[in-house]
């Protein structure tokens, strides 16, 4: 009987020892699983709105590099300029990157929106295209010209025509002149305003169109080869108001991830992809001494 009791005690001790070992392994597994969950929770997910396929391609590259920072950046592509700011303002987007400071200032003033730029992306030429003439000076009297119908891009198109010597604008018109600010039109240009996305598609029906680069590229035009006049030959003539930027809601200004997104964009890798997908048209707008907040404040004041 004593032998049986002794054996049973030994057996029970062994069972408890095995159970203890099993619990130890389970604890280690649980700990590893907990760490995996914690690591997953540490990654952040955001959505950025862009316009056009070229911008989407550039941001795809940026997003792939941000994965190493624990940031998942989803890209939502829009086909026009109105929706991305509305979506950012209502919280559907976390950031957007499609507009220059002048366009943003016009939106902020018109909608009392609390949006702000946090870093420059690129400066994109506005180009004049024609299937009728090879030199913009050769436009005939009464030539038909199509420009964007929004205030800022339409204003920039008019400034391009002024730079080309085709029209003169009222000095008091500010950074976003309108057709009513034309003070001289010696060639009697017949200027029509349409949605910016439709401008390059009007080329077959007009003597000249003045288009944003993203829409020109999407329409199969090569700004470097096909444009007969661009406004970025001398960047000093363009000004900070036409630098494009990454934009957020002001309430998110302290989000450190957003600064990481800016830093990932403002890189040599981005510049190379940008050059490839825009056929050399878009140029990096960032520098080591940027004051995007200060420059935007000035543009806001000028736009009022």
List the predicted regions and their residue ranges.
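Short, well-ordered beta-strand elements
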Residues: 41-53, 71-77, 144-145
């Amino acid at each position: 009987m004593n032998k049986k009791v002794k054996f049973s005690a030994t057996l029970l001790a062994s069972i408890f020892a095995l159970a203890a070992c099993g619990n130890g392994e389970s604890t280690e597994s649980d700990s590893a699983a907990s760490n995996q969950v914690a690591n997953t929770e540490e990654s952040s997910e955001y959505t950025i709105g862009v316009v056009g396929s070229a911008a989407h391609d550039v941001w795809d590259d940026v997003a792939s590099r941000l994965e190493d920072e624990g940031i998942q950046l989803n890209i939502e592509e829009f086909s026009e300029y109105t929706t991305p700011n509305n979506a950012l303002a209502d919280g559907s987007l976390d950031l957007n990157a499609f507009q220059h400071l002048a366009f943003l200032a016009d939106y902020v003033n018109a909608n009392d929106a609390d949006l702000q730029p946090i870093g420059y992306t690129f400066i994109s030429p506005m180009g004049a295209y024609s299937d009728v003439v090879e030199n913009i000076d050769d436009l005939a009297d009464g030539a038909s010209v199509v420009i964007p119908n929004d205030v800022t891009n339409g204003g920039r198109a008019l400034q391009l025509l002024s730079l080309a010597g085709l029209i003169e604008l009222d000095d008091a018109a500010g950074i976003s002149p309108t057709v009513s600010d034309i003070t001289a039109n010696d060639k009697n240009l017949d200027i029509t305003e349409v949605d910016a996305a439709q401008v390059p598609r009007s080329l077959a029906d007009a003597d000249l169109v003045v288009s944003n680069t993203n829409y020109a590229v999407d329409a199969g035009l090569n700004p470097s080869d096909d444009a007969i006049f661009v406004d970025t030959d001398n960047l000093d003539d363009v000004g900070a108001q036409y630098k494009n930027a990454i934009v957020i809601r002001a309430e998110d200004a302290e989000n450190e991830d957003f600064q990481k997104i800016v830093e990932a964009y403002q890189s040599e890798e981005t510049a190379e992809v940008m050059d490839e997908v825009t056929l050399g048209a878009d140029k990096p707008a960032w520098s080591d001494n940027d004051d995007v907040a200060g420059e935007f404040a000035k543009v806001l004041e000028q736009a009022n």
